Amino acid sequence: MEGQRWLPLEANPEVTNQFLKQLGLHPNWQFVDVYGMDPELLSMVPRPVCAVLLLFPITEKYEVFRTEEEEKIKSQGQDVTSSVYFMKQTISNACGTIGLIHAIANNKDKMHFESGSTLKKFLEESASMSPEERARYLENYDAIRVTHETSAHEGQTEAPNIDEKVDLHFIALVHVDGHLYELDGRKPFPINHGETSDETLLEDAIEVCKKFMERDPDELRFNAIALSAA
């Protein structure tokens, strides 16, 4: 992924909500913290939920799993509805923005956009593109890049040097046509995690998040935020 490099976004609802507002999304849906993965803490998350973003560490164990998963799907196949909006990641550290795009694009019918919304324009213009074409389109989309950079400086922790290697990565978990999809621009395709519904999306997405944590039990750097109706 050599080439463009952006500053990483924090998994911080204040940052992501402000970022989306600047891109012209009406705040009828807002990101909120998921404070824990047990039922009691999940019950504190406002419903309905239409997407979950997971921030996790890219470790050696994870990379081994990712390679095995990719090979298995390539040999066995999987069902992926054509309704899924998926894009590749070609910009280093842009995974936060790509996660947000995946979350909004796959729930576009639920969202309200302000007049002249940059994000709405990007989604409309890229609607018929391939995942690779969408990635290249984002590379040249200055309005989103500039907003991303502004948001990256607004986190609670100081933004790292732009050349610093970052081993944390965002993915989006969304419900499309009755199935739960993991959308990760580092992967060649969406991952179908089985059936879900609007009512059970949060719990089903958290089960996927738990698998990430179980693969790396010594790691603590996991953070989930949910896109909830405000």
Curated annotation (Swiss-Prot):
One GO location term (cellular component): cytoplasm
Residues with the Phosphoserine modification: 130
Description of how activity is regulated: Inhibited by monoubiquitin and diubiquitin.
Chief subcellular location: cytoplasm
Database matches in InterPro entries: Papain-like_cys_pep_sf, Peptidase_C12_UCH, Peptidase_C12_UCH_sf, UCH_AS
Gene Ontology biological process terms from the UniProt entry: protein catabolic process; ubiquitin-dependent protein catabolic process
Record field: catalytic activity: Thiol-dependent hydrolysis of ester, thioester, amide, peptide and isopeptide bonds formed by the C-terminal Gly of ubiquitin (a 76-residue protein attached to proteins as an intracellular targeting signal)
Subcellular location: Cytoplasm
Residues in coiled coil: none
CDD domains referenced in this protein's UniProt entry, alphabetically: Peptidase_C12_UCH_L1_L3
Record keywords: Cytoplasm, Hydrolase, Phosphoprotein, Protease, Thiol protease, Ubl conjugation pathway
Stretch list, region Interaction with ubiquitin. Crossover loop which restricts access of large ubiquitin adducts to the active site: 152-159
E.C. no: 3.4.19.12
Active site as annotated: 95 (nucleophile), 169 (proton donor)
SUPFAM superfamilies: Cysteine proteinases
GO molecular function: cysteine-type deubiquitinase activity
Stretches for region Interaction with ubiquitin: 8-13, 219-224
Family per similarity comment: Belongs to the peptidase C12 family.
Function summary: Deubiquitinating enzyme (DUB) that controls levels of cellular ubiquitin through processing of ubiquitin precursors and ubiquitinated proteins. Thiol protease that recognizes and hydrolyzes a peptide bond at the C-terminal glycine of either ubiquitin or NEDD8. Has a 10-fold preference for Arg and Lys at position P3''. Deubiquitinates ENAC in apical compartments, thereby regulating apical membrane recycling. Indirectly increases the phosphorylation of IGFIR, AKT and FOXO1 and promotes insulin-signaling and insulin-induced adipogenesis.
Subunit structure: Preferentially binds diubiquitin; the interaction does not hydrolyze diubiquitin but, in vitro, inhibits the hydrolyzing activity on other substrates.
Protein name (Swiss-Prot/TrEMBL): Ubiquitin carboxyl-terminal hydrolase isozyme L3
Species, as recorded: Bos taurus
